[in-house]
C-alpha cells in the first residue's frame, strides 16, 4: 500500500478552518496543504527545478512538444539535448550572463519553449512579447525591460527597434547557436542564480492602458511547478489506494500564445510534469477541434468563449473529443449558465476554473478535483502559500515605478482591481473588473453578468457589454452581439431577453450587431476598441 501523506497542519489560531478567514486581520489564508518547496537559500533556476522533477524512466519516446499544424514532434530526450546545446551557444558564443534580458518575439512554434528553457537555464531573463504588436509597442516594451538581445521570427524582426541586437529564429546565426558542437564549451552545469532573481519579464494585458512589464522570479515559477507536482502525487496516491493505475501524463493543446502568462506557465507546467504540449500558432476553433481528435488531447486551457462555441456549434459534436478529460478555464469569468450547459453536453469533461494575474505569476486560485469543479461561478480556492484581502473599493513593474506604486500598497499587497468575494467555504468568486463597471445613474452594473445572460441565448454566438456615454445617465449598458448562423434576433429581442432576468438599472439600453468581438490573445474582451467603435458609429446607426 502506498504511504499516506501527512494530513495538512491545523490552521493557526484565529483562522477559520473552512474559509481560511482571520477576523482579527481580515485576511483570507489558503486552506490548501503547503507545497514542498526547495529551501529558498538554495541557488536554483526554474529550468533546473523543472528538469529535476522529470522521471527519466518514463521519458524516452514521449513527445515533449508537437506542432498541431504539421504533426512534427520533439521527444523529451531531443528536447533536453536541444536546450543544453542552445544554452551552450547562448553562453559561449553570444556571451549571455545571468540577469541579461532577452526579448523573444515569435508565434507558438517548437523553437520557442527550447529557447525559453535555454535562457532560464543560464540565468538569463526571458521576455516574451506578442508577435503582432506594432513597432511603437515594441519600442515601449524595450524601453521598459531593456533587453540586450532579441530573438525574433523572420516576419517580426523588421518591427523591432534598430538599436537592439536581433537574432532571427531559423537563420544561419541562430542555427550555429543551437548546433551541437563538440568543439564549443558547454554552459556551466549550475549557474549562480538565486531563486529570488528575475527569471522572466512578462507584459501585462493592455486592455485598460499601455502594457506594463512584470518581473517574475525563479521562486515564483518553482512554486507554481511544485504545486502541480504535489497535485500529481496526490492523484497517484489516491489511485494506488483505490487499486487503480495513476492517470497517464496529459496531452495539452495550447491555443493560448506562449507570450501570455497563461501559455507561458502551461508549457512550464507541462515540461516539469513530463507531459506533451501541442502548440497552435494562432487560435482557430475548427483547427482546435481537429487537433483534439488527432492528438488525443486530454487537457485544454481555454477562455470561456471556447466553451460557448463547443456548446453551440454542431462541429464540436461531430468530432471525436472522447479523449478530452479536463478544460482549464481562465482569462475571464465563467458564468454558471454556460458551465451548466457545457456539463450537460460534455458530462465527462471536468471544468477546472482558475483565476490569476500576470503580476501574481499566474494562478491565484483554482478548483481542484471534480467536487470543487461543481462550484460553478467560482474560480476555486486560494493556492498554497497565498493570502488575500477583500477591501472596500509583487516584485513590481519593470521600468515603471508609478504603475508599481499604484498596484502594490505599502504593506506589499497586490491590488488586483477585481470586484470579488469569498464564501463560507473559502471559494473565491470574481464579479468583474472594478475599472469595467458601468456607472448607470449612480448604480454599478457588472458587464460580465450581462454577457453571461446574453451568451445563454440560443440565437447569440457571442456578446460583449460596454459603457456608452450618456448625458443624463452617465453611462448606458450597450451590447455588441454576434448572431448565431441563421439567427435573426433583433435589438428589441436582445433587450427584452436581458430585462426579464435583471433589475431595471441593469437593462441593456443599446444594441449593435457585429461579426466578431475583439479579444486579446488570452480571450479577454477589448472593451476600449468596442467603445471607440460605438462612438464612431454614432447614435443614428445603433
UniProtKB/Swiss-Prot annotation:
SBD1, as annotated region: 284-353
Binding site for CoA: 282, 441-442
Molecular-function annotations in GO: 4-coumarate-CoA ligase activity; ATP binding; CoA-ligase activity; trans-cinnamate-CoA ligase activity
Reactions catalysed according to its record: (E)-4-coumarate + ATP + CoA = (E)-4-coumaroyl-CoA + AMP + diphosphate; (E)-4-coumarate + ATP + H(+) = (E)-4-coumaroyl-AMP + diphosphate; (E)-4-coumaroyl-AMP + CoA = (E)-4-coumaroyl-CoA + AMP + H(+)
CDD domains for this protein: 4CL
Binding site for (E)-4-coumaroyl-AMP: 262, 331, 353-354, 358, 435, 439
UniProt KW Nucleotide-binding keyword: yes
Keywords: ATP-binding, Ligase, Magnesium, Nucleotide-binding
Necessary cofactors: Mg(2+)
Family designation: Belongs to the ATP-dependent AMP-binding enzyme family.
Stated name of the protein: 4-coumarate--CoA ligase-like 5
Gene: 4CLL5
